[in-house]
Amino acid sequence: MPHFLAKLDCKPLEYPIISGDFCFHKEFSSLKHPTKSCVYASFKDHIFLLQKIRRANDFLIKSEKATPLKREILKQALRIYAQSFEVILHNLQENSKHASGKKALDLEDFEDFIKENQAPILMEIGFGSGRHLMELAKNNPTKTCLGIEIYTPSIAQVLKQIELLDLKNLHVLQGDGRLVLESIPHHKCEKIFVHFPVPWNDKKHRRVLSERFLDEALRVLEPNGFLELRTDDTLYFEDSLKLALKHFKSEIEIKKNAQIPVVSKYEARWNKLKKDIYDLRIYSLESNETPFNNHAFDFSFDTITLNQKSVGMILKTPKIIKEGYFVHVCNIYENKGDFLVELSMGDFDWPMRLFVLSVKNQVFYLNKSPLKTLNNHKAHLLLQNILKEFDEYNHCSE
């Protein structure tokens, strides 16, 4: 991660610090950890935060992962901010010009991407090395191929291949496919592939394929489109088949040890060991005419006023856990009556780290709202109730 270390004996900084398209507006101090602060900054219209940590012998300044920037822009921001310090060490050198220019989709732009896309969508959730996903894109140039993956190394590997092979119809998104599906309108996908997911036989609630996931997949698929599971785990296959048979109307196709054109490294290893591999295709049979209404999920806040007394009480609030979602106030930062609230919240399957900014009586998410899913919206309403409770308490005690 780009960062730099600086000597402690620097003069107090005078904000704002402006250089070209960058502006470092002000510094928020942690109310929980006296050695931590957040620098509130912007690049053009994009807001981001830097973490500033005072250690025994130096300052550590690095990005805040909850407000990501493209790597080269982040390095440039840190290089500019570092000019106000006596730098001891850094890793802010410019990258080679041959570095990949292809970027993953941003979650905040994903809704617009889906809305604007007119081509049939082939989706793979958990694409690993990307062999199958890239073959899909090469063989279907008129269709949009979308890969969803959690792990950064897999995404970086596929992004390089997309650029090398000039696969303009292939896009990748970093996220949990279980939640991403919930944000997609009805009948947007032609096919969904889930190949060799982690079986999680001892922790089945962590599996990709669950009753909730299957319902969402069948909703998102076009009529006669299919969800394809490929697995070497017999128990996972059997449990998934039982889930499919729970539906009142089902069309299911099963294959065992079928030969397919693209074999992953993982699958090749099992083939050598003569291990059975199962294919389960579950077809979407019904058309859903009900309007997709995730726009009903409003992530704005009512008018709320925070002050030193209320944020002190909010910071002491324990993690609140409900069925399927939670809210945890991790930290609060302050600058002259303005507050940054650091949160972990949302769906248990994919918790989010994000920040809420309070300026005067306005409260809003920094940069982006949570992904529009039911459990995220429930967590948002819970957070709003927490903030309003202490706001109302302060008004009553005045």
From Swiss-Prot:
CDD domains named among the record's database cross-references: AdoMet_MTases
Pfam family, one: Methyltransf_4
Transmembrane domains' residue ranges: none
Pathway this chain belongs to: tRNA modification; N(7)-methylguanine-tRNA biosynthesis
UniProt feature coiled coil, ranges: none
GO molecular function annotations of the record: tRNA (guanine(46)-N7)-methyltransferase activity
Binding site for substrate: 232
Catalytic reaction equation(s): guanosine(46) in tRNA + S-adenosyl-L-methionine = N(7)-methylguanosine(46) in tRNA + S-adenosyl-L-homocysteine
Binding site for S-adenosyl-L-methionine: 124, 149, 176
EC class (word): transferase
Record InterPro entries: SAM-dependent_MTases_sf, tRNA_(Gua-N-7)_MeTrfase_Trmb, tRNA_methyltr_TrmB_bact
Protein function: Catalyzes the formation of N(7)-methylguanine at position 46 (m7G46) in tRNA.
UniProt cross-references to NCBIfam families, sorted A to Z: PRK14121.1, tRNA (guanosine(46)-N7)-methyltransferase TrmB
Official protein name in the record: tRNA (guanine-N(7)-)-methyltransferase
GN (gene name): trmB
